[in-house]
Amino acid sequence: MALPWCLKTGVLTSPAAGFNHPSDSGFAVPTKLLSIRKGDRERLRIQAVFSFPPRNGGAEKRKQLKHELVEAIEPLERGATASPDDQLLIDQLARKVEAVNPTKEPLKSDLINGKWELIYTTSAAILQAKKPRFLRSLTNYQCINMDTLKVQRMETWPFYNSVTGDLTPLNSKTVAVKLQVFKILGFIPVKAPDGTARGELEITYVDEELRISRGKGNLLFILKMFDPTYRIPL
């Protein structure tokens, strides 16, 4: 039977033959092949030490990449103060996280559902960076319920504006978004103009803590989970 991939053969010593067979398997952990005599027969006993990659190695790498991304985002006020160099750096860090996405079909996963807090975006419409800081939303949320195919975006202080819309899955990663109703100051409903409030969103990374999405025009959205139980009012 063939030796496992993780097994490195050490040195086979045969007293009867009087010579050694060096091994060159290239793996990291040696195996001692000991020859012992019992009665008139010579038996070969293999004492193997196995070495496997750390079971959580992928998770640790993912955790580190996420930490680097979030750490780089923290001083940028969700992207409002990001320079072109900052934007390039965040995009590069985001792509590293996307490359280790543990959820291959995000739209089929329950991880996508709930209330997410926006921590970074390149969307000028959301950032409103040209406005005085006191007129910008303090916090932005995006909510998704795939079972009802609903999406909601909410702002907090000072205006509490929100918008709800419908989702149409295009594949296991991308949805078409059609905004339906805006609420001004949190309670004044305004119907979205026909044909203008449409877009597409690709979910490029999602786990229990973090979600990364991309839209047309090089739009980037990075969000952290706020409330996985949140339901969008119907």
Swiss-Prot record:
Species the sequence originates in: Arabidopsis thaliana (Mouse-ear cress)
UniProtKB keywords: Chloroplast, Plastid, Thylakoid, Transit peptide
Protein name listed in UniProt: Probable plastid-lipid-associated protein 5, chloroplastic
Transit peptide limits: 1-45
Subcellular location: Plastid, Chloroplast thylakoid
Principal cellular location given in the protein's record: plastid
Keyword Transit peptide: yes
Family under the similarity heading: Belongs to the PAP/fibrillin family.
Record-linked InterPro entries: PAP, PAP/fibrillin_dom
One of the record's GO cellular component terms: chloroplast
Record flagged with keyword Repeat: no
